[in-house]
Amino acid sequence: MNKIFLLSLSTLIFVIGCAGSKPKPVTNKDLPEWYLNPPKFEDKFVGVGDALRPQFSLSKQVATERARVEVARAVETTVNSSLNDHMQASGIGMEAGATEFTESVSKSLVSTTLKGCTIEKTEIFKDRVFVMVTYDAKKAKEEAKVVARELAKKEESLYNEFKARQAFDSLDQAIDRMKGSSSVAKPE
């Protein structure tokens, strides 16, 4: 009787223990107010990020990096996408079978330099670090102008090099077309 009681009790404890291990859903009380609805500024880009890591410093670093990536996506994002659409039918008339396959793939790549991106807020909620960063829109415009000018100079330099090569090739061809004779009398 004691064995049955102990077995029943241990089974009951096991079932109760397993049933209570569901993760709690995240609620607004677990987040800073500004995380889901970041403030909007006319002259600044805003990005938010969060991280939950064993070490606080790593959490802060990862959350900050995620917030910066969000800003970088707002400043400059290159999106590559492809859509493959395949349709096939086999058989005769209304008895034909049809197969249709559609695949959509997209990838975004962010590569930009954020000079002057600053951390505005850092908060900790239940061991999770939340970070908000801002980036001055005027600085973003200036950086874009600098990059555009550098690209234009590089393209101009490449174009000038191309034109110089063309000129030398033209000169080489003109020399090759020259005849070997001259109107000057040859010395005997």
Predicted segments, located by residue:
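Domain-level marker for long, solvent-exposed, non-transmembrane regions
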Residues: 18-188
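Sec-dependent bacterial lipoprotein signal peptides
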Residues: 1-19
